[in-house]
Amino acid sequence: MSEQTKSDLKRQHILDTGRALVIKHGFGGVGIARLLSECNIPKGSFYYYFASKDAFGQALLQDYVHDYLSRIDTLFTDAGTAYAKLDKFWSAWLAQAGSEGIATQCLVVKLGAEVADLSEDMRIILDDGVDKLVTRIAGLLRDGVQDGTVRSFADPDATARMLYAKWLGAAILAKLSRTQTPLEQALAETSSHLSPHNT
């Protein structure tokens, strides 16, 4: 293994560990000392990769957005109708047997309000990631009109953003209530809203 590969793996280990901690405790709740302890690395190693905690936060969000969109692209390019792909995406927000759903792992849900006030650079990264996701959802809405599985909307882009906002709200309510009921309601409402039979 080359030194560059080892360096890349160590950096990724810090980001992966940081993501797990931030999902649980929030960005402000994770100090560098705790991160170093969890990663079992010296302080110098952290500052070799990241100039500051804010720089670490930016890298963490860039890594998260890239990973998230890559998984979405895989899902959205699978075989099947546009409606089936959208239904699979929304259903993935709910916890399934043996695994957590997207809602519990979503850094937009966890950090959106926090980083918007904390770091302009981090806010921009998350906002750009949301824009790219919404664009993908809007594309599937258009595809669904073409394949006859999704009703036609006057403004697919606005509809996609509205649907994503609905799911963010449902995810926050699910965290507050510690139940999946808000997500289940969002799934039922979204399915009804998209159906070409409910025009």
Predicted ranges, named:
Residues K85, E100-D121:
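Amphipathic alpha-helical segments used for helix-helix packing
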Residues H13, A20-A55, A59:
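Helix-turn-helix
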Residues K10-G18, L35, L60-Y64, Y68, ...:
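Generic hydrophobic, amphipathic alpha-helix propensity
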Residues D63, T74, D121-K132, G139:
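Short, solvent-exposed amphipathic helices
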